[in-house]
Every structure is written in structure tokens, then in C-alpha cells.
Regions:
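Sec-dependent N-terminal signal peptides
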Residues: 2-13
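Bacterial Sec-dependent signal peptides at the C-terminal "C-region" and cleavage site
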Residues: 12-20
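Short coil/linker segments at helix-helix boundaries
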Residues: 19-41, 51, 62-122, 129-171, ...
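Short, solvent-exposed loop/edge-beta patches enriched in aromatic
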Residues: 47-54
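A cross-kingdom marker for long, charged
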Residues: 233-277
Length: 277
């Protein structure tokens, strides 16, 4: 499963600014699969705010999504088939240039967030940046490098940062994405693997995980669309095709430049015998 996101652009005292920010621009472009435009928005912000960790976490997220799209890993047939996710006979070959830039962005986010946490252990922006950095590390290791078991370590760390953030601010809705995904992920693991992993404040309750994702899809800001994407994947995995169709129709309307949303909606309409009109 995938996950991605960020805090507001205007200092961390207000997570959800009313005025569109460079981060709004970056995420709008990301959800439209306009990766270069998303990078450009973050490049401009970093030029003015080089010591903030948040834009580097977004930059890493854009690199991740570029690779997932390039390798066809975001196709529904892949994401709903655990055997295809785990298959290792012909692992996808990562773009080494992108991988280098991805790791650099992660290091930049991590180092800056750690400096902020030394000054204030409860800094929400730093915690969220680390949550995102560990989350995209998880996805890269699991989906691109095919190291599913090893990817559980950064997944645990990402969840730990999300749980710390939610204890500080239960209304920090974007953080529920990682918390919800962790619940669903642990609940989907085989028992013998669950025995060896521990996620902070996570019991493997898949229903609770879905409720957390619904919270993001309803009340989130930057990750609101991603909450809908993950709910759509859950619905497809659980054969709730009408619910998935509604989510995909909304995403296609909101992000018309995203070819994957249109393609997946078309496949689902055909499966259900709908015209899609």
C-alpha cells in the first residue's frame, strides 16, 4: 500500500491554511501525475526555505510516484493481487538516477526534521515530515525493490511518528492516513509475521483502519485525495465495486489530467456493464 503527504506551507502552527500554498500546488500537480510541475513548486519553496524538512518529504513522494507510475505498479491489477506484489522472478528495475535523487530528498527531510525535534520534541511539522519520509521509504522498498519484509521496519517508524502526532493533535487529520493504513496492513499480514512485528497503538483491526482512511478522505487536506485512492484500493480488494466506482468517478472529476484514474474507471465501468456517462 501506498501512502504519501505533508503539512501546510505556512509554518506549522496552522496545518490547514485557507490560502492556496506552494504545497497545494505541488499536491494538485502530483494527483494529476504532472510530476515536473510538482517538483517545480517544491523547488521554488525550497529556494526560499531551505531548512524546512517538509518540502523535501514532498519531493521524495513525487520521485516515488514517478517510479510507481513508470513501472506500472499503480495499476489496480497489481495492487489488489498480493501474489503479484510479492513476486520476485522479474523484479522491476528502478531508475538509478531517480533512486539517487529519492534517497537524497529523504536524507534532506530526515536531517532537517531531526534538528527541529532537538529544539522541540513536539514539533508537528518535523513529525509529519518524518512520517512521510518513512512512509515513502516503505513503499519504495516494498513495491520497487521487492523487499516486503524489510519494508516493515520503516512502516513501523512511519506509524510511530503518526501516532505521536495524533496524540499531540487528534484533529491533525492527514496523519490518520498512516495510522489507518498501518491498521489495515497489520490486519492483512499472515499470523506468523504479525507475531514478529509491533506497531504503536495498532492491533490489526482492518475495520478501524478503514474508518481512519474514511476520516482522511472526509476531513483531510493534502492527503484527502490519497485517502480516497486507498479506500478505492480497499474496495477493489474486497470486491466492493460500486463503492470503488464512486470514488474513482470523483477522483477523475477532480483530477482530469490523471490518465490512471480515467483508465481504472473505464475498466471498472466495463466490468460493471456501465457506460460511465
Amino acid at each position: 500500500m501506498l501512502r504519501i503527504g505533508l503539512l501546510a506551507a505556512i509554518l506549522c502552527s496552522s496545518a490547514y491554511a485557507a490560502e492556496p500554498s506552494p504545497f497545494d500546488e505541488a499536491f494538485q500537480a502530483l494527483y494529476n501525475f504532472q510530476f515536473q510541475a510538482s517538483h517545480q513548486a517544491m523547488d521554488r519553496y525550497i529556494a526560499a526555505h531551505p531548512q524546512e524538512p517538509l518540502p523535501y518529504a514532498v519531493r521524495a513522494s513525487v520521485y516515488l510516484f514517478y517510479e510507481l507510475d513508470r513501472l506500472g505498479i499503480l495499476e489496480s491489477e497489481f495492487l489488489i493481487d498480493d501474489k503479484r506484489i510479492a513476486r520476485r522472478e522479474r523484479p522491476p528495475q528502478p531508475d538509478l538516477r531517480i533512486r539517487t535523487q529519492f534517497i537524497k530528498a529523504l536524507d534532506d527531510a530526515q536531517s532537517r526534521a531531526e534538528v527541529m525535534l532537538k529544539s522541540d520534541p513536539n514539533d508537528k511539522a518535523a513529525l509529519f515530515a518524518l512520517c512521510i519520509a518513512q512512509g515513502v521509504t516503505t513503499d519504495y522498498m516494498a513495491f520497487v525493490e521487492k523487499h516486503q519484509f524489510r519494508s516493515l521496519s520503516p512502516a513501523e517508524r512511519s506509524n510511530s511518528y503518526a501516532q505521536r502526532l495524533l496524540r499531540l493533535d487528534p484533529g491533525y487529520y492527514d496523519a490518520y492516513l498512516t495510522a489507518g493504513l498501518s491498521e489495515y496492513l497489520v490486519g492483512s499480514l499472515p499470523f506468523f509475521i504479525r507475531w514478529f512485528v509491533h506497531f504503536d497503538n495498532v492491533n490489526g483491526n482492518k475495520e478501524k483502519g478503514v474508518r481512519n482512511l474514511e476520516t482522511v478522505a472526509r476531513d483531510g487536506h493534502y492527503l484527502k485525495p490519497f485517502g480516497k485512492i486507498l479506500l478505492g484500493i480497499v474496495d477493489l480488494r474486497e470486491k466492493k465495486y460500486r463503492e470503488a466506482q464512486k470514488l474513482l468517478a470523483g477522483l477523475t472529476h477532480d483530477y482530469p489530467e490523471n490518465p490512471l484514474f480515467r483508465k481504472e474507471l473505464g475498466k471498472l465501468n466495463a466490468k460493471l456493464g456501465d457506460s460511465g456517462n
